Design a protein with these regions (language model features):
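Two-component/phosphorelay signaling modules centered on CheY-like receiver
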Residues: 10-29
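Helix N-cap/capping motif at the beta->alpha junctions
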Residues: 30-39, 61
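Short amphipathic alpha-helix used as the core "switch/output" element in two-component signaling
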Residues: 39, 62-75
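Active-site beta3 strand of CheY-like receiver
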Residues: 45-51
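Receiver (REC) domain active-site loop signature in two-component systems and cognate sites
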Residues: 56
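C-terminal output helix
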Residues: 107-116
Length: 122
């Protein structure tokens, strides 16, 4: 399973990647913003899931999510928002835009694993 992690913080990308690796998911691709994320999706058409931050430069996570959903292959791709945007209206906006789940930072490894479990395959 290949997972794309998109966050402008290299520290956060490393934290999320380490959580995924500790669960046995070694095939991880990273991007620093939505534009780079779209480029990674084009370069890696076999991505099985995307975890994306909301607040990023160049293209934010909500716009990135919308761009993914506009493509035929992306319409079924699980996309999980991982963000500090904890307000109810933001959660609703992300789900309406097509997010499959929503993780609020800060989080624990158990929260990430539990939220991703329905979408993960080994």
């Amino acid at each position: 399973m290949k997972i794309l992690v998109v966050d402008d913080s290299s520290t956060m990308r490393r934290i999320i990647s380490n959580i995924l690796k500790s669960s046995g998911y070694e095939n991880i691709v990273e991007a620093a913003d939505g534009v780079e994320g779209l480029n990674q999706l084009k370069a890696h058409s076999d991505v099985d899931m995307v975890l994306t931050d909301w607040n990023m430069p160049n293209m934010n996570g909500l716009d990135f999510l919308s761009k993914i959903r506009e493509t035929t292959p992306g319409s079924q791709l699980p996309v999980i928002m991982v963000t500090t945007e904890a307000e109810k209206a933001n959660v609703v906006a992300a789900i309406k835009a097509g997010a499959n789940n929503y993780i609020v930072k800060p989080f624990t490894p158990d929260i990430v694993k539990t939220k991703l479990e329905p979408f993960l395959k080994k």
